[in-house]
Amino acid sequence: MAGFIIIGFGNIVNRDKIVAVVSPDAAPVKRMVQQGKEEKIVIDATQGRRTKAVLVTQEGFLVLSALQPDTIGKRLHAEKIIEEKGDLDE
């Protein structure tokens, strides 16, 4: 079952397609985002705000979010727990 998480400002992504959630402050991540912009594989979901997290998808897309990586990680974890509890109830 595909689950979605909110990554801020009404934007949602498929939880099952997220490979990593990283901080954009490290130099390698900055290079990855810059290269991704040149290759047109970056999806900017910040609504003009500062990028605080970069989500890497299975398909190689980079999704920029204005939420902290910790916040997104907690949402990913919470969704997984809810889904597992739902499976147990059936």
Spell out what each predicted region is:
Residues 1-12:
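Short aromatic-glycine motifs in intrinsically disordered, low-complexity regions
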Residues 12, 24-29, 38, 59-61, ...:
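Short, charged/polar surface micro-motifs in flexible loops or helix N-caps
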Residues 15-23:
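Phosphoinositide-dependent membrane-docking surfaces
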Residues 25, 39-43, 79:
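Amphipathic alpha-helical interaction segments
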Residues 30-39, 44:
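Compact, glycine-rich, soluble single-domain proteins
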Residues 44-58:
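Short, structured protein-protein interaction patches enriched in aromatics and acidic/basic residues
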Residues 54-90:
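C-terminal structural segments of small proteins and small subunits
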